[in-house]
From Swiss-Prot:
Keyword Metal-binding: yes
Gene that encodes it: impA
Pfam families on file: Inositol_P (PF00459)
Keywords: Hydrolase, Magnesium, Metal-binding
PROSITE patterns in the cross-refs: IMP_2
Listed cofactors: Mg(2+)
Protein name: Inositol-1-monophosphatase ImpA
Residues given in the record as Mg(2+) 1 binding sites: E74, D90, I92
Family listed: Belongs to the inositol monophosphatase superfamily.
């Protein structure tokens, strides 16, 4: 039985084991570089630290040599994401947290096969948490298999939501994001803003969060986490309810049952363009 094309489960397991060793090695400079200064200014007020750049170089080199599969990284790009097989890397998810000294930062690594996430790894070096999964599950936490997600209620769930500026415009204006947050807060147990999309998705997969919303579209923020949530038995769509793909402009990931309720609330908020 194949997973995608000629990628069988045994080969996929070996690839993830190799990737885990590479992320373990990358965790050393990750921890050592905490509170690193900005090295590269990007669009808007985003930036990359020198550690981002160094870790991406290290992981790309190691993955390419060990697996023969190309890598698409946040900082340097690389292999096209529609390649038959490609690793997708975010060397530091939560760069602002990382530079400020917050432990809510992670290394994200997903494996796409013809655009479909077939494996994901999310390492939180400061907390020691390691999440990994293959397509079909289960989710592994620190190397141990986890039971599938249950069906909690939204009222009992903590929900993660992406950070924002209320005055921002663009595809999902700040005022729209605030209204989504407000409407969710009336129903869910608590709302949390970790400032790291990949951490939110890993925590959904682990059952720590009942659900999470990302208003972003970058593949490196989502590839690993989508694989984790799906492997754990969760549901991943965009904010319209369409199944998530590499072309999606947003993410709504949640446990069964919670996803349906969150989607209802998001849809009831109206169209983002109405908040410009």
């Amino acid at each position: 039985m194949t997973v995608v094309g000629e990628l069988d489960p045994q080969k996929l397991t070996a690839l993830v084991a190799t990737a885990a060793e590479i992320l373990d090695a990358a965790s050393v400079p990750f921890v050592a570089g905490h509170r690193a200064d900005s090295a590269v200014r990007k669009q808007g007020n985003d930036f990359a630290t020198e550690v981002d750049l160094a870790i991406e170089r290290q992981v790309v080199r190691a993955l390419t040599e060990a697996t023969g599969i190309g890598v698409h990284g946040e900082e340097f790009g690389g292999e096209p994401i529609d390649s038959p097989l490609v690793w997708v890397l975010d060397p530091i998810d939560g760069t602002f947290n990382y530079a400020a000294g917050s432990p809510m930062a992670a290394i994200l690594l997903g494996l796409l096969a013809d655009g479909e996430p077939v494996a994901g790894l999310t390492w939180l070096p400061f907390t020691g948490e390691k999440y990994s999964a293959l397509v079909g599950g289960p989710l592994y936490s620190d190397g141990k298999p986890c039971p599938p997600l249950g069906s909690p209620t939204l009222a009992d769930s903590i929900i993660g939501i992406q950070t924002f500026n209320i005055d921002s415009r663009g595809r999902f204006p700040g005022r729209y994001r605030v209204e989504v947050l407000a409407n969710l807060s009336r129903v869910c147990s608590r709302v949390r803003m970790h400032g790291a999309t990949g951490v939110d998705l890993a925590y959904v997969a682990a059952g720590i969060l009942g659900g999470a919303i990302s208003f972003g579209h970058h593949i490196w923020d989502h590839a690993a986490g989508v694989a984790l949530v799906r492997a754990a038995g969760g549901v991943v769509t965009d904010l319209t309810g369409a199944p998530w793909t590499v072309d999606s402009k947003s993410v709504l990931a949640a446990a069964p049952g919670v996803h349906e309720k969150m989607l209802e609330i998001v849809k009831s908020t109206g169209k983002p363009e109405d908040y410009l």
